[in-house]
Amino acid sequence: MTNVLFLWPPEAPLRTYLADGVAGLPQIELVFPPAASEEALLPLAAGARVMVGWRPTPALLAATDELELFINPGAGVQHLIAPFRELNERRPVILVNGHGNSYFTAQHAVALLLALTNRVVLHHNWMAAGRWRLGDAEAASIPLRGRRVGLLGYGHVNRQVHRFLAGFDVEFAALRAAWPPSGEEEPPTALRKFAEGELHPFLEYVDTLILSVPETARTRGLIGPAELALLGAEGLLVNVARGAVVDEEGLYEALRNGTIAGAALDVWYDYRPEADRSGRKYPYYFPFHDLPNVVLSPHRAASPFGDLARWDEVVENLKRFAYGREDLLNVVDLGREY
C-alpha cells in the first residue's frame, strides 16, 4: 500500500478532485490529516511513502522511515534544499516541485507590465481622490510597440508570458541557464537566445525585463546596480520570481533616481514585517510605496488558489509513482537547487 500523506487538511472540493484523479490506481491511499499541526501529522508520517505539502518540519521528516517522494505543489523550493540534502545523505528521497500555477503567474506578470506601462495605479488613485482627467503631463502611458522584452528564465512561466505577449509589436529575447538542443515546443514568435554567461549583453539588448527564475545561490543578487544601469533609463522591470534575485537597495535607488523607468513587483524581501506605529506592514526595507513609478503586488501571482486544474501535475506524479515509473515531473536537482 502506498500511503500519500497531505500535510494539511484540504477542503472538500480538492479532496474529491484528488480522489477522482487517482481512482483505480493500484494500492494507493490518500491520507488527509485532521489538522496541519505537527501533533496531528507525526502519527501518520511513519507509514507515508509520499508526502504532499510545502513546509515539512525536521521532526516530521525524521519520522518518515518509508518516505520515497515529496511533492511540493508550488514552484519555490529554496526552503527545502538544505533539509532534503541532509535527508538524502541517509537515504534517497525524491523532491519534486509543481508548476500548476504557471498560467496564473504569467497572467499576473503581464497584468503588472500593462498596469506599469499604462500608469493604471496612478490614474486610479487620482480618480479615487476626485482628481478628474489630469492628462498626460505627469503620467503618460508607455507604448509597448517597438520594445524589446527580455525574459530572464524561460521555464513554465516565461514561456507562457511569451505566448501572452506574442500579439504585441515587440521583440523577444530570453536568457536561460541551459537551452535544450531540441524536443521542446517552438516559441510562439522569433526569440533571440542568450546563454547563462551572457547576462550583461542580454540586459544591454532588452529594455523590458520580466524575471521568472528560481532563487538559488547563483541567482541571489543576480540583478544589482550595474545590471539595472544596463537596462537603461527607459527600462522596465517585472519581478514574479523571488525578491532576493534583485538587490533591494539597488532597485530602490534605480527607481528613485531614474536609472530605470519603472518596476512592477510581486515578490519581496521581508515576509514577516512588523507593523509601524500606524499598524501598517511593508514587506521591504526601503519605501517603495513612496515612489510613483512602481506597481506593488502582495505575492499573489499564483491566484486563484481555488482552481483545481492546478493540481493535475500532482495527480500525474502520483500515477507515475504508483506504476513504478521513473519519469516523474519536475524533479528537483538538489545540487542546482531547482
Can you describe what each PLM-predicted range is?
Residues 41-44, 60-63, 201-205, 227, ...:
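Structural alpha-helical scaffold elements that stabilize or flank donor/cofactor-binding regions
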Residues 1-48, 173:
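N-terminal glycine-/charge-rich "phosphate-binding" loop or analogous flexible N-terminal tail
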Residues 1, 145-148, 234:
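Phosphate-coordination loops involved in phosphoryl transfer and adenosine-cofactor binding
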Residues 60-66, 83-90, 228-233, 254-259, ...:
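Short, conserved loop/helix-junction motifs that constitute active-site signature segments
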Residues 234, 242-338:
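Rossmann-like dinucleotide-binding domain for NAD(H)/NADP(H)
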Residues 178-284:
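Rossmann-like adenosine-cofactor binding region
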